[in-house]
């Protein structure tokens, strides 16, 4: 059995991950972690998320290192916020616990800190801004279209999410922009345009527009537009429920347990893309 720990265990994503892990024949949840000094600490995890008693107590993250050393999970799954995720990965690395990270909003410096901890302690990590299988196929298609069309088409990326999402643009939109830039041999830091306002003038050559919409309960919509003279190609992915991301997490855990042969992998590795 693969022993799984989950951060943000009482939240929307955390609870869905736990319920799905518990439904697998080869996995079990052995730890649930909430924010430091959480009032939920000590509660039975299963009862908290509506599964019934599991015999696993929720812990506050201030006790993470101690509990990891005691419980010894095989992997910790993190869908929280960037700052917390970095500290969690560092602690997991010190304790020899592998990680699957779907947290978004991580900047380059935070990713560098994560990568160093993972490599220095020789653990395995699957890190992706979007774990959904369909989104990663979407990434692959976006890259192929960019490569075929070249620099003659203007590229605009539009993402939409629920009004509670904290970071913008989404990690998925940023990754799509990176893929476009890589395939067009562009420096994204120079060519990215995050929204427009006022008299911005003519669109600069090779600019990559990135736009964020927030409203209601939108789970996640992403559109990459390749706009040419007289025609437009749109590559679209829409997530209707968070289960799409959870299913990807299960794939990542299984891949890490049986096939992963390097310290840091992403969902392209998991899916063989």
Curated annotation (Swiss-Prot):
InterPro entries, per database record: DapB_C, DapB_N, DapB_N_CS, DHDPR_bac, NAD(P)-bd_dom_sf
Enzyme Commission number(s) from the entry: 1.17.1.8
Main location: cytoplasm
Keyword Oxidoreductase appears in the UniProt entry: yes
Pfam family, one: DapB_N
Oxidoreductase in keyword set: yes
Catalytic activity: (S)-2,3,4,5-tetrahydrodipicolinate + NAD(+) + H2O = (2S,4S)-4-hydroxy-2,3,4,5-tetrahydrodipicolinate + NADH + H(+); (S)-2,3,4,5-tetrahydrodipicolinate + NADP(+) + H2O = (2S,4S)-4-hydroxy-2,3,4,5-tetrahydrodipicolinate + NADPH + H(+)
Gene Ontology BP, a term: lysine biosynthetic process via diaminopimelate
Subcellular location: Cytoplasm
SUPFAM superfamilies: Glyceraldehyde-3-phosphate dehydrogenase-like, C-terminal domain (SSF55347), NAD(P)-binding Rossmann-fold domains (SSF51735)
Spans traversing the lipid bilayer: none
Chain positions recorded as NAD(+) binding sites: 8-13, 34, 102-104, 128-131
Annotated CDD domains: DHDPR_N
Active-site residues per Swiss-Prot or TrEMBL entry: 161, 165
GO cellular component terms given for this protein: cytoplasm
GO molecular function: 4-hydroxy-tetrahydrodipicolinate reductase; NAD binding; NADP binding; oxidoreductase activity, acting on CH or CH2 groups, NAD or NADP as acceptor
Associated pathway: Amino-acid biosynthesis; L-lysine biosynthesis via DAP pathway; (S)-tetrahydrodipicolinate from L-aspartate: step 4/4
Binding site for (S)-2,3,4,5-tetrahydrodipicolinate: 162, 171-172
Keyword terms, alphabetized: Amino-acid biosynthesis, Cytoplasm, Diaminopimelate biosynthesis, Lysine biosynthesis, NAD, NADP, Oxidoreductase
Gene3D superfamilies: Dihydrodipicolinate Reductase, domain 2, NAD(P)-binding Rossmann-like Domain
Functional description taken from the UniProt entry: Catalyzes the conversion of 4-hydroxy-tetrahydrodipicolinate (HTPA) to tetrahydrodipicolinate.
Annotated NCBIfam families: dapB
PANTHER family: 4-HYDROXY-TETRAHYDRODIPICOLINATE REDUCTASE 1, CHLOROPLASTIC-RELATED, DIHYDRODIPICOLINATE REDUCTASE
Similarity comment text for this entry: Belongs to the DapB family.
Protein name: 4-hydroxy-tetrahydrodipicolinate reductase
Source organism (scientific name): Methanosphaera stadtmanae (strain ATCC 43021 / DSM 3091 / JCM 11832 / MCB-3)
Gene field: dapB
């Amino acid at each position: 059995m693969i022993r799984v720990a989950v951060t943000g265990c009482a939240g929307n994503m955390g609870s869905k991950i736990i319920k799905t892990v518990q439904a697998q024949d080869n996995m079990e949840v052995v730890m649930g972690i909430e924010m430091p000094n959480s009032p939920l600490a000590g509660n039975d995890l299963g009862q908290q998320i509506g599964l019934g008693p599991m015999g696993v107590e929720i812990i506050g993250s201030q006790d993470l290192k101690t509990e990891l050393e005691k419980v010894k999970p095989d992997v910790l799954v993190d869908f929280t916020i960037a700052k917390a995720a970095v500290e969690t990965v560092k602690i997991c690395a010190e304790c020899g616990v592998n990680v699957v990270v779907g947290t978004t909003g991580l900047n380059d410096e935070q990713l560098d800190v994560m990568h160093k901890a993972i490599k220095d302690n020789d653990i395995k990590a699957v890190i992706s801004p979007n774990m959904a299988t369909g989104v990663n196929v979407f990434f692959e298609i976006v890259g192929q279209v960019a490569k075929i069309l070249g620099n003659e088409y203007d590229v605009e990326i539009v993402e939409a999410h629920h009004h509670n999402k904290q970071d913008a643009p989404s990690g998925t939109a940023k990754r799509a922009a990176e893929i476009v830039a890589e395939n067009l041999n562009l420096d994204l830091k120079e060519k990215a345009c995050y929204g427009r306002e006022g008299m911005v003038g003519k669109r600069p050559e090779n600019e990559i527009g990135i736009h964020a919409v927030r409203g209601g309960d939108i789970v996640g919509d992403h559109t990459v537009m390749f706009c040419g003279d007289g025609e437009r190609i749109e590559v679209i992915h829409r997530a209707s429920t968070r289960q799409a991301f959870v299913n990807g997490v299960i794939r990542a855990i299984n891949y890490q347990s049986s096939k992963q042969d390097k310290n840091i992998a992403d969902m392209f590795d998991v899916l063989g893309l």
